[in-house]
From Swiss-Prot:
Skewed-composition ranges (Gly residues): 17-36
Keyword annotations of the record: Cytoplasm
Cytoplasm in keyword set: yes
UniProt gene name: SIP5
Protein name according to UniProt: Protein SIP5
Segments of this protein annotated with the region Disordered: 1-66, 183-202, 210-242, 256-278, 397-421, 473-503, 517-539, 561-662, 735-824
Organism the protein comes from: Ajellomyces capsulatus (strain NAm1 / WU24) (Darling's disease fungus)
Record-linked InterPro entries: Sip5/DA2 (IPR039301), Znf_C2H2_type (IPR013087)
Location of the protein in the cell: Cytoplasm
């Protein structure tokens, strides 16, 4: 019963999942996250551990690193995207490149130049660095020289050394301690053991010593680098004098190389690098001073370099290696912009295939850009030990570490002679841009394959659509109608643009005609069209693409036109609403600021006031109405109907004083220019007001009419408006006797005589305070002088006169003098 399959056995203490973090054999894997145990040990190899433990049956122990949390952590680790991996890879490569550059600049050089770029260009270095390094060590391409931003012909040797090393340029007579050097070569130490076999392979037996003794002596003081060993090429039992075993060692070396070449791959036959003896001097000068004493300027980057630069094969122009490695082929593209030479044969490629044109010269724009390089006459730094032509290298003077500048006239003439003609692109001395980027052909083939896959997919899609259209013409018509509906929707409902509609109709008619032509084809032609040629399918795709672009342009044009029309309609609606609001506002303002109020009394007097205003505005000199004397005692209200207009004549009653109103200038008329409507309104208010007597009403109405008559601007001075003023005495004289008329006439005559010297002055009545008019003093002369000493006026008349004329004054100006008389 206890051995049934359903009963789980308790694991031992050493293999328990709970206690196995540090004591079991798998405790280390569990402590690291519980993931290594799953991958390293199968489930069957752990008899004491339950299967439910691996399925994560204990979620409460997930914080210990056991259970589903471990799977979640591993899942989070696996979510890294390809872009992040590429970014991390590029960052690692960049860091490694920086370290390699620092190491190479400290330990490696070729004739005083470097094998890594100097930072003139900060872009991506997409050239093959191994190929460039090999070409520089072989002296077929100029090394990356240190460029100088400035140069002076007067610089001394230590100044040139400081500029080449990137230090501050000292004074001409000042030599820093780090730039001091000794020309005496060091002696060979007695305790230094130099292998004879290395000397046999690095020196050549010559009959005469070279003239550059310093370089020869310095070469013997520096042994071969310990990293480069030639012991496998020689027999380990070689002994004796160097002269006896010289040629035997070479024969054994050649035999070993020949034997190894039969069993080695081409990758293993790459040349081996050799570190030449370190010699900081060339012909008794520091190598920096020797290189930079006659620098040349690169015409592209404008930096000064030693006179050992690359030359273009076509136009023989200087170009540094920094600029040369930046020039490359164009990316694969279609041959629309290809500039083919008419004399060259047509390439064997189908139409429409991607091409990659070779780089052109930056100076003469000739294709197949390449450079050639002539190395300096000395060898320093790294070099190669060729495996296939070792005997030729050993016998050539270029393999020696000595300088060849002063001894060999033939080599001197070769190095200094300028090339007269251009070199061919196939010349072995020419380095093409394709050589430092050998993967250009692979990139071109990849781009062509990708374009072919896209073209095949598009061809299959179009063929399937064509077959579907041939088999189901009803669906084709439905698709055509849907496209027409879509086009109709883009044009907009109710659009009045006839040009767009005509263009759409023409486009639809053309498409319908093409569809009809396809339907009318014979079965044989239809069968042949199912598998069209590649060129014809490509042309059809181009035509369809152009048609789609045209329809898209038409749709965008119609959409923009519809948007413009809607915008114009919206602006018109806004303008109409604005005008309507302005009209309502003006009407409301006019109703609010009307001429008369809406009370019943003003409405009743509207007609009379308007007639008075019109009459006052049109008549130049309105006559004064002659009022009949009232029989009452002045308590009756003078109605407007009691006014009677006499005929327009100048006849007056005899004995009445005739007073005329003149204006000397326009300023007086502008001052006394109230509106006629306002004067009429005041006149009516004066008529309907309750006054003490009819004479008081008469004076108020006369004053109102006088002000109203004076509101006519700029009237002719030749026509004198005659205003007949009837004084209170004249009214009383009409009622009583005629004798007093003569007295009044005498007073009027006296007044005329008094006013005769001042005819130019205007005479106007002083406005009453009840009218609310302000008049400047001295600008108006009022001549209302009643006769004094009238014995015929009774007591009642005197009372009325005292009552009515108590507040009136008369001002008479004669030549600038003002006489003020107060009556009463």
């Amino acid at each position: 019963m206890g051995n049934t399959a359903t009963k789980e056995a308790r694991p031992p203490a050493g293999t328990s999942g709970r206690n196995g973090h540090g004591r079991g054999p798998s405790g280390g894997a569990v402590a690291l996250g519980g993931l290594g145990r799953f991958h390293n040990q199968p489930e069957s190899s752990q008899p004491g551990v339950s299967s439910r433990h691996f399925r994560g049956s204990r979620p409460d122990l997930s914080f210990l690193g056991i259970g589903p949390a471990v799977d979640r952590d591993s899942f989070v680790e696996r979510k890294e995207t390809k872009q992040e991996r590429d970014a991390r890879r590029l960052a690692r490569e960049r860091a490694a490149r920086i370290k390699e550059r620092e190491r190479s600049m400290k330990e490696e050089h070729v004739d005083g130049g470097y094998l890594v770029t100097q930072g003139v260009y900060t872009g991506v270095e997409d050239f093959n660095k191994a190929v460039v390094r090999q070409l520089m060590i072989e002296r077929r391409l100029a090394p990356f020289w240190k460029g100088l931003e400035e140069f002076s012909d007067s610089w001394t040797e230590h100044q040139l050394m400081a500029a080449a090393r990137g230090l501050l340029i000292p004074a001409p007579d000042e030599i820093p301690p780090e730039l001091e050097y000794k020309l005496t070569p060091p002696r060979l130490p007695e305790d230094q053991d130099l292998p004879d076999q290395n000397l046999n392979n690095l020196t050549v037996p010559i009959t005469s010593r070279s003239q550059s003794y310093n370089s020869d002596l310095s070469s013997t003081t520096h042994p071969v680098s310990p990293s480069i060993s030639l012991q496998p090429q020689l027999s380990p039992g070689v002994s004796g004098s160097p002269g006896a075993h010289l040629f035997r060692g070479r024969a054994k070396t050649l035999a070993s190389l020949t034997a190894s070449s039969k069993h080695s791959s081409p990758g293993e036959m790459s040349p081996r690098e050799l570190q030449l003896p370190k010699d900081p001097f060339v012909n008794g000068q520091p190598i920096e001073a020797y290189l930079y004493k006659n620098p040349i300027e690169c015409p592209i980057c404008f930096l000064y370099y030693p006179p050992y630069l690359n030359r273009t094969r076509c136009c023989d122009q200087w170009i540094c290696s920094e600029c040369f490695v930046q020039i490359k082929r164009a990316d694969p593209h279609l041959p629309e912009h290809e500039q083919r030479d008419p004399n060259s044969p047509s390439p064997d490629r189908p139409d429409g295939q991607l091409i990659s044109e070779p780089a052109g010269c930056p100076f003469c724009v000739q294709p197949d850009f390449g450079v050639s390089y002539t190395p300096p006459p000395f060898r320093r730094g790294l070099s190669y030990i060729p495996s296939n032509s070792l005997d030729k290298t050993l016998l050539s003077p270029a393999s020696s570490t000595s300088s060849l500048v002063s001894g060999n006239a033939n080599s001197h003439s070769i190095t200094t002679r300028r090339r007269a003609t251009s070199l061919s692109a196939n010349s072995p001395a020419v380095i093409m841009t394709d050589k430092i980027r050998p993967d250009w052909a692979h990139k071109l083939q990849t781009a062509r394959a990708q374009a072919a896959r896209r073209s095949a997919a598009a061809t299959a899609l179009h063929a399937a659509a064509y077959i579907n259209a041939m088999n189901n013409p009803i669906e084709t018509r439905g698709m055509g109608s849907s496209s027409r509906r879509m086009l109709r929707r883009t044009t907009g409902h109710g659009s009045d643009n006839s040009t767009n509609q005509a263009g759409s109709v023409a486009l639809l008619a053309e498409r319908r005609a093409i569809a009809a032509d396809r339907e009318n084809d014979s079965p044989a032609e239809s069968t042949s069209n199912l598998a069209p040629a590649r060129a014809s399918s490509r042309r059809n795709r181009m035509d369809e693409l152009e048609e789609m672009m045209m329809m898209e342009a038409i749709r965008l044009s119609l959409a923009s036109e519809e948007e413009r029309r809607k915008k114009e309609e919206k602006e018109a609606k806004k303008e109409a609403k604005r005008r309507e609001r302005e009209a309502k506002r003006a009407e409301k303002l006019a109703r609010k600021n009307g001429l008369y109020s809406n009370n019943p009394s003003s409405v009743a007097l509207d007609a009379t006031g308007s007639n008075t205003a019109v009459r006052t505005g049109r008549e130049l000199s309105p006559p004064v109405s002659v009022l009949e004397p009232s029989s009452d005692k002045g308590k009756a209200v003078d109605r407007p109907g009691s006014l009677s207009e006499p005929p327009h004549t100048d006849t007056q009653l005899p004995g009445l004083p005739k007073l005329s109103l003149k204006t000397s200038d326009d300023d007086l008329s502008s001052i006394f220019a109230p509106s006629s409507a306002a004067a009429a309104k005041r006149s009516h208010l004066r008529h309907i007001s309750s006054s003490s007597s009819s004479n008081s009403s008469l004076v108020g109405s006369a004053c109102g009419e006088l002000i109203g008559s004076g509101s006519t601007p700029n009237f002719n001075s030749a026509i004198e408006p005659v205003l007949n003023f009837r004084s209170l005495d004249a009214v009383i004289d009409d009622e009583n006797t005629n004798g007093s008329r003569h007295e009044h006439l005498e007073g009027a005559t006296k007044l005329k005589k008094t006013q005769q010297p001042s005819n130019d002055n205007a005479i106007s009545p002083r406005p009453n305070r009840d009218l609310g008019l302000g008049v400047e003093p001295g600008s108006v002369q009022q001549a209302t002088v009643p006769p004094q000493g009238d014995s015929s006026i009774n007591k009642d008349e005197n009372d009325v006169r005292d009552k009515e004329l108590q507040s009136h004054t008369a001002e008479t100006m004669h030549g600038g003098n003002t006489n003020l008389e107060t009556v009463g």
